[in-house]
Amino acid sequence: MTSGGKVRIYELSRDLGLDNRDVLNAAEKLSIAAKSHSSSISDGEAAKIKALLNSNGKAAGGAKAPAKPDAGNQILSLKKAPSTPSQSAGAPASAPPSRKPEIVAKPAAPASPAKPAPSAPPSRKPEIVAKPAAPASPAKPAPSAPPSRKPEVVAKPAAPASPAKPAPKPVAKPVAKPASAPAPARPAQPLRPQASNRPPQQPSNRPPARPAAKPPVVMSKPTAPPPRPARPGAPAPRRDQNRPAVPMRPPNQQQRPSPQRSGPPRSGAPIRPGAPQRPGMPGRGGAPQQRRGPGGPGGRPPSSLELVGKPIRREPNAPQGRQGGAPSRPGGPGGMRKPVSPGELMQLQKPGSRPTPGDGPRRPPARPGSEAPRRPGEAPNRPNAPTAPPRRPGYRPAAAPGMAGRPRRPDWDDSARLDALRSRSPQKQRQKVHIIGENDDSLAAQTGGFAGGQEALVLQASLARPSKPKNLPGNKGARPVALRRRKKETTRQRQRRRAMELRQAREAKQIRPEMLVVPEGNLTVQELADKLSVESSEIIKSLFFKGIIATVTQTLDLESIEKVSQEFGVPVLQDDIEEAAKKTVEMIEESDLDHLIRRPPVVTVMGHVDHGKTSLLDAIRKTRVAAGEAGGITQHIGAYQVDVDHAGASKKVTFLDTPGHEAFTAMRARGTKVTDVAILVVAADDGVRPQTLEAISHARAAEVPIVVAINKVDKEGAQIDRVKQELSDQSLLAEDWGGDTVMVPVSALKGEGLDKLLEMILLVTEVEDLKANPERMAKGTVVEAHLDKAKGPVATLLVQNGTLRPGDVVAAGPVLGKVRAMVNDSGRRVKEAAPSSAVEVLGFSEVPAAGDEFEVYPDEKAARSVVGDRASEARATRLAQQMASRRVSLTSMSGQASEGELKELNLILKADVQGSVEAILGMLEQLPQGEVQVRVLLSAPGEVTETDVDLAAASGAVIVGFNTTLASGARRAAELAGVDVRDYNVIYKLLEDIQAAMEGLLEPELVESPLGEAEVRAVFSIGKSAVAGCYVTSGSIQRNCKIRVHRGKQLVFSGDLDSLKRMKNDVKEVNTGFECGFGCDRFADWQEGDRVEAFAMVTQRRTLAT
């Protein structure tokens, strides 16, 4: 009670034992303004609402007058007129006051026993069909049933009796008239009702809004063998016998719950199924389901009630009354269902299908979904397509007490919502079918009343079906939960798979490659990380420390790739170098197939520097080439032809000796490109080295067989098995270890194993079946080229097909020439060069490029046309290389220009052969050029001329010669012009001097040079200043040097030492063990115990930043 004589709606509903909505509906009818349960009304308005609700309750009670069972009728129905109010819950007419909550629906006529009434108004109420167990067994009354149960559901007893007789008209009459057995409609043995899983609720006094249009019809039908005999007078135990009746209350027509959404928890609002369950699945409380029990499939009773007809449109806010569970059929196991009181009456009607002997005339089954108008008293008949229990507008059964706070189930309201449920999911579509067990009185809670002028009462809450367990397959939420579980499992599996892939990738990345092959000279950061088997963050961090800001997708140039790879200990091999080893031109043409003969093999000796390649060839040729090489290393590619005795015959073998230094990669690639067999020389005491791996990659790119010569086996510390193991890691497994790679231990100095090595070479070449056509014009490759000061341009050519003769017109790349003379490796002139022969050719107009293919043309005109096109392409390539040699970007140029003049080192490079020029240029590109750029103005083989001197003088360049000489007059011109000319014969020294020249262009940097330390032992004040008396502990202290004063761990002063005295005399330096006085113009806060550190700033030459 609020202040000022006001009463809130929820207090009034609590006093009356009703739901808030009931009180709100009554207030709306009386035009009392009340919006919600917390609205306040006056005492007078509360009294009006109480009077209205009490009067409606008395009317409902009047409808509950006991009706005597008609002995001649098996099917009864209760219905009341629209003007008759419901009986009050507190004063039932004949039922015990607290025996059972009943929901009183508002029928169309006063209560009377159900009879065949042809004049019943048409309604869309479905029919409830009872399927008895025994054929033609009418229901008999239970003498011992409590008298308060007025309506009864008729079921067939076990003993055969007269069948139930339906109404004379098959469809027009809603009541089936039994043929005999004038007993009440209950079997002799009361059945145990299905216990409700929800507590009962207080009775509702809310009157119904409109009378029921027509009741459903229940028909008794035998469908299975007769059940066990019923025991009269033995009712099953009841749990809820003292519950008051619950009258019906009208629904609100403004709110309609969605079939897919449960309404808010309300008092007296039980859960109503939003969609019917499938047959055989246990339903929720109040849902008409098929019961499991003996005598039927799946444990269901042999007979059931079938709901026939289309659901009735419900009002939006109709409260959902509790659906009582149906009692089980006779003959079921004891204690399964509670007995149904005689006051609970339903109409029984036989379904139109499965006729049995003894049954009366049946109604024709209605078409599913048909909504045709019916005659008064006619009920729809759909025996084979049961649907949800219909609800008539204007009726809202109140729920049992204790249902407050329970979520409501949405009800079907119209066909549109039904279609939406049908199309929503297969689960909901299957839930439309109801298979109702025999004597299932839950339909009364949804239909409210029946035809015949009688009122049907709703079952007790204790008879309602319990909610379905969640683990059963029929649970409505089971399918969505399963779907969600599958999604989570899929996500979990995907995460597990990704974690496994990452773990496997991490394990695979533990092994780093022996060599990094860079395609097209660039890689992204992520690709570089994958090739190096490291995380991309490590690459980015390494680049950041080198002053390069990069992202994962940024492309790196070759220089940056080499820097990072060297940090991780992996050498870099450019893909274009490997491509240079591939054989791109086929020397054998189709016209040569008829003239092919066997040719000598071309064997290339490859391996790491100082592993004995040239010494091995010297041992084979019985020469001393290695002794005359500068620096003891090979810096040119050499071609030699050797006669080898094999099987009593002399055979020729052409050997190509390649340099082992890392600068001569292109030379090794060219040697591999023209070879037939690769000899891999590995020192037994050194094992596999970087250039060894490079040689292996070249041989595999050229697709040539590899013969391994394990050299220096006579040397102390030689480990042949270690070399074989390291080679097996590169997929080269020795024959004696079960592989297919020929490995021969040799000693070049002692000549051991050479015969076996030559024999293995010849055996391998025989398998290759090497052939050529000597009758055609020559075709081959330029192995090496240089400019001789006496002979002019000289090129070493390897003839691969045909025969080369003097006078032939040769086109080698963009260079045209005519063969004037040919010299073999022994220095003798030859008249012709057969296939697999290497000769030096004179007569070219200029030095050809090493590695170019040459071909002989029939006349000079044809050769000149080909050369002209190649010259244009070569010129464009050369210009592009010159522009790239500057390696200056706009960013670096602007950054360096802001600091001062751009520093460049201009070079003019002249070498003896083309291969040396390539090697030197390659090494210059590897020098760090972040601060000083190397600009090669001219690079060519040949001697230094006056023209080169003039170019160097004009551009301020340095002339670098490698294994070459100065032309006549060039040295004097250089002295006059002041041009620096350097000549080298070892590539190491050349690279060191060039790097030193680059560092010389850098500005020197100032660095600290420590001098000594002193300790303050006394402080003397002189005017406003102070002097520190110090003792030199180490080194020496010089006047005007830099000092730092430390007090403990704190730096208190850093500056110049202005005064240094000893015994009142100014001195320049004080050594260790002497005392002196310090004076500083800017510092006077001396304290005893201070430590003075003396140092000097000196200039130091800077080095190139790597």
Swiss-Prot record:
Domain (tr-type G) spans 598-771
Q: Region G2: what ranges?
A: 632-636
Map out region (G4) in residue numbers. Answer: 711-714
The main place the protein resides is: cytoplasm
Keywords recorded for this protein, A-Z = Cytoplasm, GTP-binding, Initiation factor, Nucleotide-binding, Protein biosynthesis
Pfam families from the UniProt entry: EF-G_D2 (PF22042), GTP_EFTU (PF00009), IF-2 (PF11987), IF2_N (PF04760)
Specify where the region named Disordered lies, as residue ranges: 57-434, 466-497
**Record GO terms (molecular function):** GTP binding; GTPase activity; translation initiation factor activity
Regions of biased composition (Low complexity) lie at 57-72, 81-97, 172-199, 251-292, 319-329, 395-405
Q: Per the record, which residues fall in region G1?
A: 607-614
List the biased-composition ranges (Basic and acidic residues): 408-422
Composition bias, kind Basic residues: at what positions? 482-497
Q: Under what name is this protein listed?
A: Translation initiation factor IF-2
Name the source organism.
Synechococcus sp. (strain RCC307)
